[in-house]
Amino acid sequence: YCQKFLWTCDTERKCCEDMVCELWCKLEK
């Protein structure tokens, strides 16, 4: 899961379905 204050995105964990985390996931891909 994703913590809103950290905005972490991992391969094993699904990104937040919110706005920011999804963008970060693509950037850190």
Swiss-Prot record:
Record-stated family: Belongs to the neurotoxin 30 (phrixotoxin) family.
Taxonomic source organism: Eucratoscelus constrictus
Record keywords: Calcium-activated potassium channel impairing toxin, Disulfide bond, Ion channel impairing toxin, Neurotoxin, Potassium channel impairing toxin, Secreted, Toxin
Other remarks in the entry: Negative results: does not show activity on insect voltage-gated sodium channel (Nav) or insect calcium channels (Cav) in cockroach DUM neurons.
Physiological role: Insect-selective neurotoxin that potently blocks insect calcium-activated potassium (BKCa) channels (Slo-type) in cockroach dorsal unpaired median (DUM) neurons (IC(50)=3.7 nM). This occurs in the absence of any shifts in the voltage dependence of activation. At high concentrations (330 nM), it partially inhibits cockroach delayed-rectifier potassium channels (Kv) currents. May interact with the turret and/or loop region of the external entrance to the channel and does not project deeply into the pore of the channel.
Gene Ontology molecular function: any one: toxin activity
Superkingdom of the source species: Eukaryota
Protein name: Lambda-theraphotoxin-Ec2a
SUPFAM superfamilies to which the protein is assigned, alphabetical: omega toxin-like
GO CC annotations, alphabetized: extracellular region
The record's note on its domains: The presence of a 'disulfide through disulfide knot' structurally defines this protein as a knottin.
Subcellular localization: Secreted
Tissue: Expressed by the venom gland.
Disulfide bonds: 2-16, 9-21, 15-25
